[in-house]
Structures are given as structure tokens and as C-alpha cells.
């Protein structure tokens, strides 16, 4: 076989690869932390605390928090017995999965202005539910920051996004 140029899916760097995996000689955790650092450079100074969407948003949130010198809090607690919600085939299952998967940590978010960091938005299902969850938990403000560019087109080989109209970018 002829050796072909490697063309990894960008989602390997953003989400799929384990944080301790190496991609092109660099740890995925470091890529993700750097994404948060770069995001912080572009963002306004808002928020009392930085809250990651667990678990994949944690490295970017750490980078963001370190750059902005804003406290890092686990404002969302993940149930590790619930799997990936964005790959479920139906919207109602995805929405229900978010409620099972995450809960707000009220003691760390009450009356706080939150900078919420997630790695990506595929459809927007998770993000909108989480923002509501944080407000219901007592957050004063929620400022969403995403550490990867918007997903605009279908991916027939990787993430479960078959139609352009499903992308969260369609709603912005």
C-alpha cells in the first residue's frame, strides 16, 4: 500500500481522543488546555468563576481560568454511568440524557457570574439544557464560551451529524 498523508478528524483533538493520548507528538490534554488559553485571549473579562462542562470541557476551562486568573469551580457534577448524549439518534433521548448525566453544584454557583466552558457545540442540545440548569441552581449570570470553531457541515464518518440543518451553527 502507498503511504497516505494522515488526515485526522479535528474532533480527535477537541473531544474523541482520551486526554492522555498523543496526537502528532503532543498530549491531547495540552492541545485542549491551549484551546482554552487561546479562547481566553479573545474573550471579554466577565465572570466570577470558570465552570467546565465535564468531562471534555475541563482542560479548556483550566487553560481559560489560568489565563484570566479567574477561579475554577466544578459547578456541574457528572454522573459517570451515563454515556455520550450527543450521539443518541433522537432529540428527546439526547435531552433526557443531559438531565441524567449532569447536575448543578449549587454550593459553588449560587449568586455567581459563571463563564461556562465547553469543548464544542454539535447540535446545541446540551448547552441550552446546561445553561438552564445553572440558572435553576442559582447562578446570577452564565456566559458560554466554546473552545472549538462551529461545526457547520455533516460528518458522515465521525460525529453523528448527518444534516447541515442539525448543526447548532444553523441556530446562531
Functional labels for PLM-detected ranges:
Residues 64, 120, 142:
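Hydrophobic, well-ordered secondary-structure elements that form the walls
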Residues 47-54:
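Short glycine-rich phosphate-binding loop at a beta-alpha junction
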Residues 57-61, 79-85, 122-125, 149-154:
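Flexible loop/turn segments at secondary-structure boundaries
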Residues 113-127:
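Phosphate/diphosphate-binding loops
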Amino acid at each position: 500500500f502507498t503511504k497516505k498523508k494522515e488526515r485526522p478528524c479535528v474532533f480527535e483533538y477537541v473531544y474523541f481522543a482520551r486526554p492522555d493520548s498523543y496526537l502528532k507528538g503532543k498530549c491531547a490534554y495540552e492541545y485542549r488546555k491551549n484551546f482554552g488559553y487561546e479562547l481566553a485571549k479573545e474573550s471579554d473579562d466577565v465572570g466570577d468563576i470558570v465552570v467546565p462542562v465535564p468531562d471534555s470541557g475541563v482542560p479548556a476551562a483550566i487553560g481559560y481560568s489560568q489565563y484570566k486568573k479567574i477561579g475554577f469551580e466544578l459547578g456541574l457534577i457528572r454522573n459517570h454511568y451515563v454515556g455520550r448524549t450527543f450521539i443518541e439518534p433522537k432529540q428527546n433521548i439526547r435531552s433526557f440524557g443531559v438531565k441524567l448525566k449532569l447536575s448543578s453544584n449549587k454550593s459553588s454557583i449560587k449568586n455567581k457570574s459563571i463563564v461556562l466552558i465547553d469543548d464544542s457545540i454539535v447540535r446545541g442540545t446540551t448547552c441550552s439544557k446546561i445553561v438552564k440548569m445553572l440558572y435553576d441552581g442559582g447562578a446570577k449570570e452564565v456566559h458560554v464560551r466554546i473552545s472549538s470553531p462551529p461545526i457547520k457541515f455533516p460528518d458522515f464518518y465521525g460525529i453523528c451529524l448527518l444534516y447541515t440543518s442539525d448543526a447548532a451553527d444553523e441556530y446562531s
